Amino acid sequence: MAALVQRIRARAASLPTFDIPFLLILLLLLSYGLIMLFSAGYAVALYRRGDAYTYIRPQLLFAALGVLAMYAASLVDYHVWHRLAWPMLGISLLLLTIVLFMPEYNGCKRWIVLPGLGTLQPSEIAKFSIVLVFSHIISLNHDRMKSFSTGVVPFALILGVVTVLMLLEPHLSGTLLILSIGAVLMFVGGTGLQWFGLAGGLGAAAIAAAVIALPELVPYATDRLASWRDPFADPLGEGHQTIQSLYAIASGGLAGLGLGNSRQKYLYVPEPQNDFIFSILCEELGFIGAALVVALFLLLLLRGMSIAVRARDKFGALLVVGFVVQVTLQAILNMAVVTNTIPNTGISLPFFSSGGTSLLMLLGEMGIVLSVSRQTDMA
């Protein structure tokens, strides 16, 4: 008996040690998101498909697959991604090109239809590949990041190609998110601050040019900008989604109407299971429920940064920073859209919004973070 206990203890000691606080925060976010997805989406699912489980059923499947992918990724030495960085970028560029030949949905070409399997969103894979390849380049050239040729040119070329392909979809929010992730990694990686000033000037010029050309390049974007400035100017058209979202948030008050008791999800808020799920959460769970979501994302960021600081090399640290910043920035952008702080850009809330590709990629990325945490100096 004593020998059996000793073998069990030895086996337990040999198992990989994850960052438990990070894992717990992640599982809380995932569970919270699944509960809210069913609550927010069952009414529209019943109306559209005659099945209240239309959205939650595949999401549960992808959540299970994602957890398995996360566990598998956590067991793999994260240095393997050095070799896979460029192939992943190549795959992303190929998929971003293929999607341009797909049928339009709501005026955009963002999804590749996989017969019998659903849809694939290439921008999700692009975000993943940007973190990989930027971390790879920076970790190999960290002592030369101050120079323009090393610290700016390769990143600008990669971002340029990716963002042009995404703007052709068009996917403005995804483009903004990828540019932000790239900028954060370059800053953390040591790119000279003077180049950020130059990039800021060029970016301002590009934004000015885009605003001038916007009606021709992206016709629907001008309507969204107008509805952002005054959604009540067109309450039954472009402003409808924003107005109904604000009604939902205001109805929630401090403690909300109760889980499942939203009124706005009954075909008032368009896409309550997707981009605007946060407004339904605010209505049902109030300020307290919304504050809990914000706190969980903030804790995920802080714990991720703690892992990055303790990482054994620059590559691991950059991977963690890239992935947790991606999740946090995406959550911030989604909440900003839902509250009409910024124009509606069509961006999902990580771990909450319906979307199998997104959830699978997110959990896989979190598995890489856990892999880095296994090899920290204090693991």
Where are these regions (language model features)?
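Hydrophobic alpha-helical segments of polytopic membrane proteins
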Residues: 86-93, 149-167, 172-213
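Membrane-helix boundary/helix-loop-helix interface segments in multi-pass membrane proteins
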Residues: 2-29, 35-170, 335-350, 354, ...
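Hydrophobic, glycine- and aromatic-enriched re-entrant/interface helices and adjoining loop segments
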Residues: 105-111, 119, 198-292, 312-319
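Transmembrane alpha-helix boundary/anchor motif
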Residues: 68, 76, 133, 208, ...
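Alpha-helical transmembrane segments of multi-pass membrane proteins, especially transporters
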Residues: 124, 132, 150-155, 178, ...
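Interfacial segments of multi-pass membrane proteins
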Residues: 138, 176-195, 263-289, 348-363
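Alpha-helical transmembrane segments of integral membrane proteins
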Residues: 26-30, 66, 92, 158-162, ...
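Hydrophobic transmembrane alpha-helices and their immediate junctions
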Residues: 287-331
